[in-house]
Amino acid sequence: MKIYTFILSACLLLVCSACHEASHYLLLGGSGWDKIAIVNKNTKEIEWEHPLEKGWECNSVAVTPDRNILFSYSKGAKLITRDHEEVWNISAPEGCEMQTARVLPNGNYLLAWCGYPATIMEVNAKGEILSKTDFDTHIEQPHAQFRQVNKNKQGNYLVPLFATSEIREISPSGQLLKSVKVDGNPFSVAALDNGNYLVACGDAHCFIELNFETGDIVRKVNENDIEGAQLFFVAQLLPKRDGGLYICNWQGHDGEAAKGHYPQLIEINGAGKMVWDLNDNATSG
């Protein structure tokens, strides 16, 4: 069974990671929610779930090549089997927050925690640390630093920083190579085939296509640009191979959002038309 991978929070904060378009299932989890769950995309019913402890903040989850499940939680990152067995657990230091856990194209895993210093690690399937990058975000509160770190084709790390509204490129040695300012509090960065990046701009209620080399915004999708949906906190963007896109649309900073049909997860096609959505506060918070 192939699985699309997403994240929800207790208020259905949605973020997403590696996917295969042939899938009819979604892997969902998230900050404040008491579980990670596999949901049938067609019926929107939970078909598998793994309990999470109260207070865990799960902002990344992924299906690994061998069908295990990788996820971050505030105190660390875990790899578990579908039978709920723990393969390994890597803890974040006291006072730090593990916010990133993703599968890299080479099959290894990328983990990152906020703190002093902030740290990015690459580990293998056994949980053995292959590399470690420490760097200073110059942001006082760890919780205001970042959520999802990514790696570019050049082998450097792209870090979207909440408090300073910027995307930083960090080398494996921890050197700051480049910084580009964006709107809002960026949550995630996703590469496109044309070399540009999609940036989820959080509370700016928008996402952009960014030429990172020049700093130019190629296009911007605003709060009311998608018919049938309204963007709130844009948490993560997942480009599809067919030109479509999944948009994770957290309602948490708007008390009125949950009262109407404002999809928490939106799928649009290459023309920007909404073709599927998920809006289920009753089940997921």
Explain the meaning of each model-derived region.
Residues 22-285:
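Secretory-pathway ectodomains
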Residues 1-4, 8-23:
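Bacterial Sec-dependent signal peptides at the C-terminal "C-region" and cleavage site
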